[in-house]
Amino acid sequence: MTSRRHLVLGSALLPWIAALPARAQAAPTRLLLGFPPGGTVDQISRHLSARLGEGVRVEARVGGGGRHAVEELMKAPADGSTLLLTPMSMVTLYPHLYPQLGYGAADPVPVAALASLGFALGVGPAVPASVRTLADLVGWVRAGGSSLPGYGTPGPGTPPHFIGALFERGAQCTLPHVAYRGAAPAMRDLLGGQLAVYIGPEGDFLPHLAAGGGAVRVLAVAGERRSRFLPDVPTFAEQGHGATGLDRRELYALFLPRQARPELAQQIAARARAVLAEPATAALLARLGLQEAAGGPAELGEVVRVDHAAWGPIVSRVGFTPES
């Protein structure tokens, strides 16, 4: 979810994108991303420029929480000259949220699943050290332990937003949502004591946990099982919060424009599998708090279908609208 994670993952794919089928290379190949580089723009730009390959360029279509990049993909020709690397929720969740969206979940052509990430709930120095579990957190909130805002997330209408809303309802406590413009400012406020709780990708917490000092404590992870990156942290369900939706994960995937040929998607997916099999790719994903995810067009298409169907009842239960 953070811009650094999107861009570094994109850079790892550029060598094989540069070797796309001949028709795709007849014109510059665009790799669309929906998020800005943020504070690491110089480092990421150098990394990308060294690996772009002939005729390939990364193009950030920033805005709308990633929606604009998907909408740009929908306008592109279906000849392989434009690809999209995006969190899957831009395709599966957003059609439930925005009635005027320029695409549906079935419109982008699935190519390959690349990596998955889990979400976690963590607290910062504004929360007493005695708060070690979700039960402790709920008790502290109910007792009026803080005058600070509720839980922060990287943005409104994102998976962490819904995880927080479902937790608040299940715990029967008042924990308002605070939407940030990305993970970086939210983590800054969490570490600075201006935010009590943050829900976001596990990778957002890992550098601070590795630094030690106890400034950040992760109380729960979303998902059906514990995270390989946070094996000592119990899931929401293990702590008595098993509502549907608290098992949400995110998937990074590649898509082509609507009506792209199946053979083209298969060719690109085969190259993606080769890159994912490289040890350097595995090391990169681990540093970012991501797990490898395998799946070609058919498998990704089924995951998209199931995920889109799962989000509908969750959105209805939370009652989210763009105006809310």
Question: PLM ranges: what are they?
Answer:
Residues 20-31, 77-81, 138-149, 211-215, ...:
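Immediate post-signal peptide segment of exported/extracytoplasmic ligand-binding proteins
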Residues 20-107, 156, 172-201, 206-208, ...:
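N-terminal (or domain-start) structured segment
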Residues 75-81, 96-185, 236, 251-284:
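Hinge/capping helix and adjacent helix->loop/strand transition within the periplasmic-binding protein
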Residues 6-24:
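N-terminal export signals
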Residues 169, 173, 263-324:
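An extracytoplasmic/periplasmic, membrane-proximal ligand-sensing/linker region
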Residues 116, 206-276, 309:
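C-terminal lobe and pocket-closing loops
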Residues 89-100, 166-170, 197-233, 312:
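A ligand-binding cleft/hinge motif common to bilobed small-molecule-binding domains
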